[in-house]
Amino acid sequence: FKTIDLDMVSNNILNSSESLSFLENYFPTAVEKNFINKETLASIVFNDREKLTVLEDFLHPQVLTKLQEIISESEGVIFVEVSAPRNLQNDFDCLVIFAPEHTRKERLKKRGMEILDIENRINSQKDGEWWLSLGTVLHNQDLNNLYSEIDKYLNINNLH
């Protein structure tokens, strides 16, 4: 199945010249020598909800436009990986791949994130109930279990 990673789409948009100009205006400390320091930007927006909203309001419409473009050029079942769905569940069948907070924290630690950054990031997100309300929930214990759950969902819904 084709998979679209919206974090990658977002990063591509953030690295554009239009985004650089926007970031220089709104988040000047996150721009160094015409390059975006993503750690600095993340630190800014995950510590200030208003600044996160400013970034999302700039970025999300562009991400949605790019997503629609990619989908229009594709056929069949497409998986879209989304970390911040912002109403996408209204347009698509939504599988929520859910892991408990302690599991998410452990995974982020293994990726080298500091505990304060992890806490700030998690605290800026919607709570578990909101995520669970978005669609069909698959509990993410490990990859083998996840693949099995996805296969079951696809078979039940005749999407294979």
Name what the model sees in each region.
Residues 20-24, 101-109, 119:
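An amphipathic alpha-helix signature
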Residues 8-75:
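ATP-dependent small-molecule kinase phosphotransfer cores
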Residues 1-5:
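A conserved segment at the C-terminal end of the G1
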Residues 19-24, 95-96, 114:
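Short, hinge-like loop/turn segments at secondary-structure boundaries
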Residues 67, 110-160:
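Small-molecule kinase domains that catalyze NTP-dependent phosphoryl transfer to phosphate-bearing small molecules
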Residues 14, 45, 56, 89, ...:
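Short, flexible helix/strand-to-coil boundary loops that buttress conserved ligand/catalytic motifs
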Residues 9, 100-104, 143:
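Conserved nucleotide-binding/hydrolysis micro-motifs of P-loop NTPases
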Residues 68, 72, 77-111:
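ATP-dependent NMP and nucleoside kinases share a basic, alpha-helical "lid"
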